[in-house]
């Protein structure tokens, strides 16, 4: 089980709802992923009119927990306003907080992110901040009151996988009591498994499933990868070595096999 703000879930795979070829494929992919939490853009919901109503009906049919986000916000004020609107629309204090610094890389504005997180937490929000893998930023977010931190593996939609393994490993070691979710940059199920092998509590992805040739099958593949990665972490991975180490014992080896 994984805990998000005192709520427990069995699935460690969070999934986005954008970019799918059709609403039906989105539904089927979310079911195949076994996800219990889905991210939803406030801008999509409010700008869609009747389309937005239909989309919301599809989400309700899935019986999942909705995590609204502030995607596209570039300032603290814009992010805070969007979060408050999302709370009214979706009836939840949960918010995936994004404050973007650069349109090309979609890199978080970490200064604005910490400021916005502090404001929202004081206003009763449960904040899921999208950030870089910087330990200092993560610590500031925790100090502000975040019980969940969501560092990227790589830029959003890049599909590069984990580009700074050591930094993500350090975050896990230094923040043992914080729920950590790798968010963004994952492109293959193996990337998700690697994140879970590092001890991350969950992963969040969207494009890797939505843009796959078969999103439904890919969603199932990610589900299995997350389960495998978590099982491996809990089982205890052996440490990598610089030199070979025989797996077959030499005790009892016939003398004619001995090396002179």
Swiss-Prot record:
One Pfam family matching this protein: ThiG
E.C. code: 2.8.1.10
Catalytic activity as recorded in UniProt: [ThiS sulfur-carrier protein]-C-terminal-Gly-aminoethanethioate + 2-iminoacetate + 1-deoxy-D-xylulose 5-phosphate = [ThiS sulfur-carrier protein]-C-terminal Gly-Gly + 2-[(2R,5Z)-2-carboxy-4-methylthiazol-5(2H)-ylidene]ethyl phosphate + 2 H2O + H(+)
Pathway note: Cofactor biosynthesis; thiamine diphosphate biosynthesis
Alphabetical keyword list: Cytoplasm, Schiff base, Thiamine biosynthesis, Transferase
Catalytic class of the enzyme: transferase
Molecular function GO terms recorded: thiazole synthase activity
First-listed, main subcellular location of the protein, grouped into a coarse class: cytoplasm
InterPro entries the UniProt entry points to: Aldolase_TIM (IPR013785), Thiazole_synthase_ThiG (IPR033983), ThiG (IPR008867)
Any one GO CC term of the record: cytoplasm
Binding residues annotated for 1-deoxy-D-xylulose 5-phosphate, in chain numbering: 157, 184-185, 206-207
GO biological process: thiamine diphosphate biosynthetic process
Active site: 96 (schiff-base intermediate with dxp)
Subcellular location: Cytoplasm
Coiled-coil region list: none
Chain's role: Catalyzes the rearrangement of 1-deoxy-D-xylulose 5-phosphate (DXP) to produce the thiazole phosphate moiety of thiamine. Sulfur is provided by the thiocarboxylate moiety of the carrier protein ThiS. In vitro, sulfur can be provided by H(2)S.
Subunit structure: Homotetramer. Forms heterodimers with either ThiH or ThiS.
Similarity annotation: Belongs to the ThiG family.
PANTHER family, A to Z: THIAZOLE SYNTHASE
Name the record gives this protein: Thiazole synthase
Native source species: Nitrobacter winogradskyi (strain ATCC 25391 / DSM 10237 / CIP 104748 / NCIMB 11846 / Nb-255)
Top-level taxonomy: Bacteria, Pseudomonadati, Pseudomonadota, Alphaproteobacteria, Hyphomicrobiales
The encoding gene: thiG
């Amino acid at each position: 089980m994984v805990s998000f703000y005192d709520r427990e879930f069995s699935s460690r795979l969070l999934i986005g709802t954008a970019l799918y070829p059709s609403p039906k494929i989105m539904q089927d992919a979310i079911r195949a992923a076994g996800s219990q939490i889905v991210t939803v853009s406030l801008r999509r919901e409010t700008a869609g009119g009747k389309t937005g109503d239909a989309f919301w009906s599809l989400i309700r049919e899935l019986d999942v927990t909705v995590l609204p986000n502030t995607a596209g916000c570039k300032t603290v004020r814009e992010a805070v306003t969007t979060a408050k609107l999302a709370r009214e629309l979706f009836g939840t204090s949960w918010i995936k907080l994004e404050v973007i610094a650069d349109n090309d890389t979609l890199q978080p504005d970490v200064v604005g992110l910490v400021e916005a997180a502090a404001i929202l937490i004081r206003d009763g929000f449960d904040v899921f901040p999208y950030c870089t893998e910087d330990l200092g930023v993560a610590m500031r977010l925790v100090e502000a009151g975040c019980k969940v931190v969501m560092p990227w593996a790589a830029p959003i939609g890049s599909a590069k996988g984990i580009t700074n393994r050591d930094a993500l490993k350090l975050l896990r070691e230094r923040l043992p009591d914080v729920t950590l979710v790798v968010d963004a940059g994952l492109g293959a199920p193996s990337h998700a498994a690697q994140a879970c092998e590092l001890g991350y509590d969950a992963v969040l992805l969207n494009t890797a499933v939505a843009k796959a040739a078969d999103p439904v099958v890919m969603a199932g593949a990610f589900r299995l990868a997350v389960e495998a990665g978590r099982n491996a972490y809990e089982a205890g991975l052996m440490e990598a070595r610089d030199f070979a180490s025989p797996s077959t014992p030499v005790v009892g080896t016939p003398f004619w096999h001995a090396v002179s």
